């Protein structure tokens, strides 16, 4: 069987750029069980540094959650109000910011100097004390994930920890462990390159802490007949003799990442179609193996196709030692012989299968083993020999390090059949990977074991369920086991929980659920507000529902029965797959229903995984992070990420950040908020982070002054006010001009009063505009089509008109103001939520608090198209001789969102999923009079503090601090107040722009 045929060389995609430093594993902590205890007492001394990544889970406000503590003294913990406290006795630092974003990761650094303490979150200083003294330390117990010396159930962490460094003797800042990404701006990890001091440690909670158990098969032995490094070498006679791992390991599923496979070989027989190292059991294109092809080249192959050969026949190396190395570096595959590169090729091939690693042949595809000797076989998860540079192969034994995932020495007696993997350590969850062996032990009781090592990390964030994301009735499940177990709360009501990721409507996706008992459903739903009282599905929403218990297994779509008796029962593993919008339901790895209704029916509404429980019913879920405790997870997705109980369907992916679609635009290039203090001068330049400013909205924060709005189409010296209906004014003391990334203001108190504080919201469009004749009336348009935003000016006429907007699709928000006369601002959008419809047969007024007004003459009762919006005969939008400006927007994934939500009237308010961390939000009730246009941003609120700061678009008053609670989160916006201005039981329109897409955001 020609498994290594040189004529089947596989083409590959263009080389991908490097991903930077990757964190591979985290450790899940929850409830009364989780903590790790240092094996010996610990006595810290200042200075020291602690660096750790944390992802929060259940926000149990009734208890303190310790990340670490030493002997009732130094500690780091989340308080009952979710602030962060660091104690270094006798001083305690407590943040004003509240940290309760459970959808993503925080990085925390404690920098301790002899007379100062500095606390950082995500690279930014959040609290400090520069006049403190350190308490004399005494040696004592140290715990990770719980109180010390004795952890109690009400002090343990609910969440995940990753990459824990304690650097003893040195005070370091966050720049030693992370950096701001130059493109997206999020804080990301870098590899720490320093030491830890004799008492310090590094706990990566990584799979590298586990050795692979190796077994000799057939006549494979250690032999003293040939030696390269030690007293013996590994002898493989041929045929199916081999040394193999006792179990499959995900370690060798490289995905698209870097690797090195190397070793010393001594062929006694040079034969084609023989293998050296094998990681396959089938001809899958996602498996890999290395051996001799039909031209006597050493080659790496996948399936039955060679992806790189040595281009050098190996006959010349018969009966002598030769060093072979295959590497991949940032998408380039290379092969070296004796340290010299012999060939290379672009390869981003995805090696995703989990199989037993084998030295020699003997796989199910009939590949025989290379006959001869091997020594110092090493596999690494990085590229050790970069750039094609010639190197001298080591003639001494390799030393294990954190990048080694397999290392087999041979230095033993003749004919020994004991083979040992010398990679990693034989320690435990808390193995110290520094040079100090300052290990931590798991508790003597409970289930804290290696199955709690998870794939969810700061460099690959996985979906889980989201306590902030409740159902429309504000019912709440119990959240257990890192938010991966839902329900069990009792009672006589149904409760829904939603995942913190949406399911993309394109691509292939897979997720699993184990039913633990009771009346329970799984499914996909487009919004918590898709279902009204009586299970009525709102127009434009979708609900894919699998009742797995109550009716013996019934499939529903939008509450309509699709199939009955398809299978039910507790203890089973159920699954959902989505293939380009086609939804399938599974039970025990078999498809029980394929929906004819495509996910695209949800339109712009995000679709989330949902579980429903009644009474004491419970679900356990796995999005691929590897819930090995209860799911027995083992199979990665098609990209090699995660672990599932069953092998996902072909090409299907886990819901994790690495798999999310790449955002099309960088938000900070299209919207920017600037805070500045006025100087009273007549010509003040304000600089933004945009390449060009085309629309600016300025408001004084510290006093009562009009809002000022100017743009490059009308000209910098022409101004409108959002807070009244007055006509456009012209003058040089307000916003004077635009120039690239800057705009200039004069001395007017609304934009530049001496000592006054201001906020400027800035959008990039496309300069001063150009003529557009798509409509019945000619318009001038400055359109940023990639960002879905445009400025339009036009002149009115008698009758009804259409106006070209310049965007690539229909806008979902149009704001129009008459420039020539005093008339109301008109706001149109299309929203349908819980019985309230806004659809361009009505309007809101930006300068007023009134609710929707139904009227046909503003928009001519006509929704926008991909080229025009419509206006009727109302003078606010169309009148002979009047001039107008319109600001048009549509949602752009990862950058902007125009949507609606249903307030729940609770202090634990509505969560609005946006798919990004918001930078700016404006919202207004559609069906409540006397509710304001609330405007807020991430600069007015640099941290979540429980009481947001905002302004009112229709009101000239100063900013309103500490009045309405809300949180900016990594994937949306959470309301924490009951006011009619943001969260009474009415329906709200919102407009939001992003700081970062969810794929590239930190927890906030």
Predicted regions span which residues?
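Low-complexity, glycine/proline/serine-rich flexible segments
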Residues: 1-46, 81-83, 210-255, 431, ...
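Extended recognition patches within non-cytosolic domains
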Residues: 2-25, 30-32, 160-211, 228-232, ...
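Extracellular glycan-interaction surfaces
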Residues: 3-31, 51-60, 74-134, 211-240, ...
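Short surface loop/edge beta-strand patches of beta-sandwich-type extracellular domains
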Residues: 30-48, 93-100, 148-153, 188-193, ...
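Extracellular glycan-recognition modules
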Residues: 33-85, 116, 170-175, 240-299, ...
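Extracellular, beta-strand-rich glycan-interacting domains
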Residues: 47-58, 112, 154-184, 203-207, ...
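Extracellular glycan-interaction patches encoded by glycine-rich segments
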Residues: 88-94, 138-161, 303-311, 353-375, ...
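Charged, alpha-helix-forming regions
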Residues: 206, 448, 456, 465, ...
């Amino acid at each position: 069987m020609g498994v290594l045929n040189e004529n089947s060389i596989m083409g590959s995609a263009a080389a991908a750029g490097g991903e930077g430093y990757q964190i591979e594993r985290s450790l899940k902590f929850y409830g009364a069980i989780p903590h790790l205890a240092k094996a010996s007492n610990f006595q810290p001394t200042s200075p020291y540094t602690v660096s750790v990544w944390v992802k929060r889970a259940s926000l149990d406000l009734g208890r303190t959650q310790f990340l670490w503590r030493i002997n009732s003294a130094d500690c780091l913990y989340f308080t009952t109000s979710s602030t962060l406290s660091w104690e270094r006795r006798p001083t305690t630092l407590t943040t004003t910011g509240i940290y309760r974003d459970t959808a993503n990761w925080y990085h925390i650094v404690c920098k301790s100097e002899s007379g100062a303490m500095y606390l950082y979150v995500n690279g930014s200083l959040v609290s400090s004390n520069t006049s403190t003294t350190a308490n004399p330390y005494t040696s004592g117990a140290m715990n990770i994930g719980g109180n010390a010396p004795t952890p109690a159930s009400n002090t343990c962490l609910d969440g995940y920890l990753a990459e824990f460094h304690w650097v003893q003797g040195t005070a370091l800042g966050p720049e030693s462990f992370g950096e701001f990404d130059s493109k997206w701006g999020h804080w990301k990890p870098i590899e720490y390159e320093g030491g830890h001091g004799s008492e310090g440690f590094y706990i990566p909670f990584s799979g590298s802490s586990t050795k692979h158990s190796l077994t000799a098969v057939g006549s494979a032995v250690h032999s003293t007949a040939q030696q390269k490094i030690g007293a013996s070498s590994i002898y493989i006679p041929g045929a199916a003799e081999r040394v193999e791992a006792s179990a499959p390991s995900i370690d060798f599923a490289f995905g698209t990442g870097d690797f090195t496979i190397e070793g010393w070989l001594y062929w006694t027989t040079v034969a084609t179609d023989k293998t050296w190292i094998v990681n396959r059991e089938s001809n899958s294109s996602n498996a890999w193996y290395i051996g001799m092809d039909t031209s006597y080249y050493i080659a790496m192959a996948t399936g039955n196709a060679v992806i790189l050969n040595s281009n050098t026949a190996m006959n010349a190396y018969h009966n002598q030692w030769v060093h072979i190395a295959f590497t991949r570096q940032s998408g380039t595959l290379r092969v070296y012989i004796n340290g010299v590169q012999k060939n290379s090729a672009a390869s981003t091939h995805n090696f995703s299968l989990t199989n037993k690693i084998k030295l020699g042949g003997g796989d199910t595809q009939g590949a025989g083993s290379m006959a001869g000797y091997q020594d110092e076989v090493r596999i690494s998860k990085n590229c050790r020999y970069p750039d094609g540079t010639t190197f001298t192969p080591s003639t001494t034994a390799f030393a294990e390090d954190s990048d080694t995932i397999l290392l087999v020495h041979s230095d033993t007696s003749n004919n020994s059949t004991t083979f040992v993997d010398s990679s990693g350590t034989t320690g435990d969850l808390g193995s110290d990977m520094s040079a100090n062996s300052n290990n931590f032990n798991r508790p003597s009781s409970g289930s804290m074991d290696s199955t709690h090592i998870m794939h969810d990390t700061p460099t690959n964030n996985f979906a889980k369920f989201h306590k902030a994301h409740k159902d429309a009735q504000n019912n709440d499940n119990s959240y257990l086991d890192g938010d991966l177990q839902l329900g069990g709360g009792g009672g006589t009501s149904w409760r829904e929980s939603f995942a913190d990721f949406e399911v993309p409507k394109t691509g292939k996706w897979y997720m699993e659920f184990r039913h633990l008992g009771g009346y329970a459903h799984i499914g996909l739903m487009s919004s918590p507000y898709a279902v009204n009282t009586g299970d009525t599905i709102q127009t434009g929403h979708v609900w894919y529902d699998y009742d797995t218990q109550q009716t013996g297994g019934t499939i529903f779509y939008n509450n309509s029965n699709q199939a009955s008796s398809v299978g039910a029962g507790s203890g089973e593993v159920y699954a959902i797959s989505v293939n380009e919008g086609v939804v399938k339901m599974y039970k025990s790895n078999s498809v029980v229903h394929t929906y004819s209704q495509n996910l695209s029916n949800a339109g712009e509404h995000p679709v989330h995984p949902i579980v429903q429980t009644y009474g004491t019913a419970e679900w356990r879920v796995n999005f691929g992070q590897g819930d090995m405790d209860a799911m027995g997870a083992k199979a990665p997705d098609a990209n090699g990420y995660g672990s599932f109980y069953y092998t996902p369907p072909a090409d299907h992916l886990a819901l994790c950040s690495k798999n999310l679609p790449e955002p099309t635009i960088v938000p900070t290039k299209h919207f920017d908020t600037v805070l500045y203090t006025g100087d009273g001068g007549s010509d003040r330049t304000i600089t933004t982070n945009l390449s060009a400013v085309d629309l600016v909205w300025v408001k004084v924060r510290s006093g009562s002054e009009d809002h000022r709005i100017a743009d490059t189409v009308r000209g910098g010296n022409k101004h409108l006010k959002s807070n009244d209906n007055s006509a456009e004014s012209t003058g040089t003391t307000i916003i004077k001009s635009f120039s690239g990334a800057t705009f200039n203001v004069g001395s007017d108190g609304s934009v530049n009063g001496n000592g006054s504080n201001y906020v400027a919201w800035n959008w990039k469009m496309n300069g001063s505009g150009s003529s557009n004749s798509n409509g019945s009336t000619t318009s001038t348009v400055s359109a940023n089509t990639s960002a879905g935003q445009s400025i339009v000016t036009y002149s009115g006429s008698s009758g009804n008109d259409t106006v070209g907007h310049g965007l690539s699709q229909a806008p979902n928000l149009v704001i129009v103001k008459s420039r020539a006369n005093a008339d109301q601002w008109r706001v149109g959008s299309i929203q349908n939520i819980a019985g309230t419809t806004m659809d361009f047969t009505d309007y809101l007024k930006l300068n007023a608090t009134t609710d929707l007004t139904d009227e046909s003459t503003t928009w001519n009762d006509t929704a926008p198209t991909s080229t025009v919006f419509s206006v009727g005969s109302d003078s606010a939008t169309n009148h002979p001789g009047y001039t107008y400006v319109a600001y048009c927007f549509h949602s752009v994934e990862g950058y902007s969102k125009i949507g609606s939500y249903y307030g729940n009237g609770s202090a634990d308010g509505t969560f609005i999923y946006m798919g990004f961390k918001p930078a700016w939000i404006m919202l207004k009730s559609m069906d409540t009079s006397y509710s304001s246009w609330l405007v807020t941003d991430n600069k007015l609120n640099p941290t979540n503090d429980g009481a947001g700061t905002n302004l009112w678009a229709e009101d000239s008053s100063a900013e309103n601090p500490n009045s309405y609670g809300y949180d900016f989160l990594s994937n949306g916006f959470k309301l924490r107040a009951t006011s009619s201005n943001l969260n009474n039981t009415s329906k709200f329109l919102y407009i939001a722009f992003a700081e970062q897409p969810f794929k590239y955001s930190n927890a906030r």
